[in-house]
């Protein structure tokens, strides 16, 4: 399973939000490039970057920081936040970014998503950010009436390469991932699912690993890496592609299997 460190950009700095609240941001580094290099040095084989300013503005804002990170590391990068038109997506791919994460336009402009999936096969990921099972948009500032499961099915039909599922109530809280929501999602789609939000410990990671046969192929880890609750090297050893054993130890997770 992929363990993907998250780098959230706000005003050019690396921050973490609490439940997506811009007023509750915590700065972890003034230099996102150093952070990216640190995660790659510790074994990350993929990075997750969110342009928080972009998500709010509806266009890419932290392009300078994104470009600097892309030049500084050799691992593939996925980026989301403010990608609401073809030009923005093309702009990122021109920098060598591997995947574009689309959120708001998946709800508001599905036709555009279909066109982008056709033009950039395998490179369009849909970010489904949910509050109580319903999809939030525009930097999580608005909540729609669309169910996460409905949107996932529609996006799979339109050609999305994968779904990143974020439970907003858990994001930045360290209270554990929403396993039930991930199971529900995995039951209705066959494309890969990447879990995000609330991961706080190796125990959480092992419970997600139990969902790998159902299609949960990766996990994005943010705050827990920055606070030291999870050490990236340990996480990779526990659930990563080269993990010590394919069957996690029996730590009482049988109910998650």
Swiss-Prot record:
GO CC aspect terms: cytoplasm
Entry annotated with the keyword DNA damage: no
Catalytic activity: 1-(5-phospho-beta-D-ribosyl)-5-[(5-phospho-beta-D-ribosylamino)methylideneamino]imidazole-4-carboxamide = 5-[(5-phospho-1-deoxy-D-ribulos-1-ylimino)methylamino]-1-(5-phospho-beta-D-ribosyl)imidazole-4-carboxamide
Superkingdom as given in the UniProt entry: Bacteria
Active-site residues (renumbered): 8, 129
Top EC class of this enzyme: isomerase
Single Gene Ontology MF annotation: 1-(5-phosphoribosyl)-5-[(5-phosphoribosylamino)methylideneamino]imidazole-4-carboxamide isomerase activity
The protein's annotated pathway: Amino-acid biosynthesis; L-histidine biosynthesis; L-histidine from 5-phospho-alpha-D-ribose 1-diphosphate: step 4/9
Acetylation is among the record's keywords: no
Keywords (A to Z) from UniProt: Amino-acid biosynthesis, Cytoplasm, Histidine biosynthesis, Isomerase
Record localization: Cytoplasm
Pfam families reported in the protein's UniProt record: His_biosynth
EC numbers: 5.3.1.16
SUPFAM superfamilies named in the record: Ribulose-phoshate binding barrel (SSF51366)
GO BP terms: L-histidine biosynthetic process; L-tryptophan biosynthetic process
N-terminal signal peptide: none
Homology family: Belongs to the HisA/HisF family.
Protein name (Swiss-Prot/TrEMBL): 1-(5-phosphoribosyl)-5-[(5-phosphoribosylamino)methylideneamino] imidazole-4-carboxamide isomerase
Gene (UniProt): hisA
């Amino acid at each position: 399973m992929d363990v993907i460190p998250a780098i959230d950009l706000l005003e050019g700095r690396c921050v973490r939000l609490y439940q997506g609240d811009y007023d509750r941001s915590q700065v972890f580094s003034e230099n996102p490039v150093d952070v990216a290099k640190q995660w790659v040095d510790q074994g990350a084989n993929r990075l997750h970057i969110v342009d928080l300013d972009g998500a709010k503005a509806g266009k890419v804002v932290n392009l300078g920081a994104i470009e600097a990170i892309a030049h500084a590391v050799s691992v593939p990068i996925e980026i989301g936040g403010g990608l609401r038109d073809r030009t923005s997506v093309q702009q990122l791919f021109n920098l060598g970014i591997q995947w574009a994460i689309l959120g708001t336009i998946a709800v508001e402009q599905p036709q555009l998503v279909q066109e982008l999936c056709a033009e950039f096969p395998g490179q369009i990921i849909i970010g489904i950010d949910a509050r109580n099972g319903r999809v939030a948009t525009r930097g999580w500032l608005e909540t729609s009436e669309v169910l996460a499961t409905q949107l996932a099915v529609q996006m799979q039909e339109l050609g999305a390469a994968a779904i990143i599922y974020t439970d907003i109530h858990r994001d930045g809280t360290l209270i554990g991932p929403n396993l039930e929501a991930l199971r529900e999602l995995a039951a209705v789609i066959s494309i890969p699912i990447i879990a995000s939000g609330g991961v706080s410990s190796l125990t959480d990671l092992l419970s997600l690993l139990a969902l790998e046969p159902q299609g949960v192929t990766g996990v994005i880890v943010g705050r827990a890496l920055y606070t030291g609750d999870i050490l990236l090297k340990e996480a990779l050893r526990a659930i990563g592609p080269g993990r010590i054993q394919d069957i996690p130890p029996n730590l009482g997770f049988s109910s998650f299997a």
